[in-house]
C-alpha cells in the first residue's frame, strides 16, 4: 500500500502561527502546478523526510490533499542557516504524462587510474539538468571514471541516457577531469640561499 504524504491546507498566514506549527513538527510549504493554483500548505516533517530519503531526494512523491491523490516533486527547499533544518518547501504538482525539467545529482563511480598515478580528480559538475517523465526521474546519474587517465576529461556527451531522458546541457561541458600531479621542482622552485645574505652583491656600497 502506498504511503501518502498528507498535505494540509494552511489558512492562517500569521508568522506566529507558522512558528507554532514548526515547533509542533510541521514544515510550511507551497503547492503549485500547471493546473494547480498556488496553495499554502504544511506537512509533517518526519513523514516528509522519510519519503524524501526513499526517493533519493529527487523522485516522485505520492501525496494526499482534500481526499485527492496527487503526485508531486520537491522544487525547492529552504534551510535554516545555522541549524540546517528545513524551514520551507516548494512542491510542484505534476502530470505523469508530461515531461518536466529537474536537476539530478551526479555520482562519480570508481577510482580513476590517473588518481592512482598521482593525478588529482576535479569534478566540475555536480548536478545534471534533464527533461524527463516524472516516473522516470533517477535518484542520481552514475558516471564511471575508472579508466580516466591523467589529462583525460569526461564530458556530458559521455553520459548514456538510453532514451530515458534528455540532457539540458551542451555535450562539451566538462563533468570531471584528472589534473597532472604538481612537479617537485614547482613546489621547491628556486635555489636556496644562506639566510641574511642577499642573492647579489651588485650595487652595494662598501667602505674602504
Curated annotation (Swiss-Prot):
Protein name per its UniProtKB record: Large ribosomal subunit protein bL25
One of the record's GO molecular function terms: 5S rRNA binding
Cellular-component GO terms for this entry: cytosolic large ribosomal subunit
Keyword rRNA processing tagged: no
InterPro entries membership: Rbsml_bL25/Gln-tRNA_synth_N, Ribosomal_bL25/Gln-tRNA_synth, Ribosomal_bL25_b-dom, Ribosomal_bL25_C, Ribosomal_bL25_long, Ribosomal_L25_dom, Ribosomal_uL5_bac-type
Record text on subunit structure and interactions: Part of the 50S ribosomal subunit; part of the 5S rRNA/L5/L18/L25 subcomplex. Contacts the 5S rRNA. Binds to the 5S rRNA independently of L5 and L18.
Family of the protein in this entry: Belongs to the bacterial ribosomal protein bL25 family. CTC subfamily.
Basic and acidic residues biased stretches: 182-208
Domain of life: Bacteria
Record's function text: This is one of the proteins that binds to the 5S RNA in the ribosome where it forms part of the central protuberance.
Keywords annotated in UniProt: Ribonucleoprotein, Ribosomal protein, RNA-binding, rRNA-binding
One BP annotation, GO: translation
Pfam family, one: Ribosomal_TL5_C
Region (Disordered): 179-208
Amino acid at each position: 500500500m502506498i504511503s501518502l504524504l498528507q498535505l494540509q491546507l494552511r489558512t492562517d498566514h500569521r508568522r506566529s502561527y507558522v512558528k507554532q506549527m514548526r515547533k509542533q513538527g510541521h514544515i510550511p510549504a507551497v503547492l503549485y502546478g500547471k493546473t494547480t493554483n498556488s496553495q499554502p500548505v504544511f506537512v509533517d516533517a518526519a513523514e516528509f523526510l522519510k519519503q524524501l530519503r526513499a526517493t533519493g531526494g529527487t523522485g516522485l512523491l505520492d501525496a494526499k490533499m482534500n481526499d485527492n491523490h496527487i503526485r508531486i516533486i520537491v522544487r525547492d527547499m529552504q534551510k535554516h542557516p545555522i541549524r540546517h533544518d528545513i524551514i520551507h518547501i516548494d512542491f510542484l504538482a505534476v502530470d505523469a504524462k508530461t515531461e518536466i525539467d529537474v536537476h539530478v545529482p551526479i555520482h562519480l563511480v570508481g577510482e580513476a587510474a590517473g588518481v592512482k598515478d598521482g593525478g588529482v580528480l576535479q569534478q566540475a559538475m555536480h548536478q545534471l539538468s534533464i527533461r524527463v517523465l516524472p516516473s522516470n526521474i533517477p535518484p542520481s546519474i552514475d558516471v564511471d571514471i575508472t579508466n580516466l587517465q591523467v589529462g583525460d576529461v569526461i564530458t556530458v556527451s559521455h553520459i548514456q541516457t538510453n532514451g530515458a531522458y534528455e540532457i539540458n546541457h551542451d555535450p562539451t561541458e566538462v563533468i570531471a577531469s584528472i589534473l597532472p600531479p604538481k612537479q617537485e621542482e614547482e613546489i621547491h622552485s628556486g635555489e636556496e640561499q644562506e639566510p641574511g645574505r642577499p642573492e647579489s652583491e651588485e650595487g652595494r656600497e662598501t667602505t674602504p
